[in-house]
Amino acid sequence: MTTPWENHQKLLEDLDRKQKEREAREQRERQEAAEAPLREQALELAKTLVDLTRYRNERNLMLFPFCSTAKAKRIKSIRYSSADGRHWLEVTANYEYGMAKIWDFDILRFALSKAGEVALQVGYFPASVEFSGYECLKALGRNPESGSNLKWIKEGLRRLCLTGYSGNIFRENEKITEIFTLIRANYTDQSGKLERISITFDERLVESVRYSKGLLVIDKTLLCEEAGIKKRLLELVRVSMGREISWTVGIERLQALCAHEGTLKRFKYELKQYALPWEVTFSKAIHNGGNVTFAAEGNAPKGEQ
């Protein structure tokens, strides 16, 4: 049973939190008003052909399991909770089209990369971008004339738009559950070449980039990776390591972060098959199935290989 003093403290904490949220919101509104001319310039540039100097993705999309890593259609939801229980994410598939796949996210990576390039030139990250199927496929290293690739873009956009999310990943207030999708999209396809595609980012992605420096550079080779789990690891491990020389994680948690649906034994076997840009070592543990460490070459701990 809580005491009057504890109730008073809780009330003060809630008032303080609400004041901080209000001040942050007012600051964003003032910033938006000041940046109005840049916004219009950025939105216009985002409709034109822009050469990419680097490829990018949003930090949370790299850290958490936002998509399926399997080639097959996935209907089963992803339910992830952080080790401390403070952050959680549920990913829900559309029954007809299935869950967004990690390869579909290449379309989103391209769109974020283009928006990031616009921000680099103008100083403002646009909330939407436009491009052609040819522009997107060429940037992703795929044959831009291929009918199957153009079909993939249309199917991928549908999965990206219809995959639903709920959780508290993007917000500081962990008590609030948000329900959202990552993008809205439309396209024009009168010639069969997808001459115009428009993607509007969810406000959570936009705010992460504008206010939290959430847009990170990624290696272009990631876009060419065909193995779903390896593709996931190339982003997850790099962002988790940060500037450190290694990253250690429980193998069960890593399996959850990779949205792997098989057994733990199978997941560990698959990990050992990949040629990764880090030294990978496994250590045994009594309760959680053991740990796996990814380390820069020459810095791996001794353990079970």
Residue ranges and their predicted role:
Residues 1-305:
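Charged, alpha-helix-forming regions
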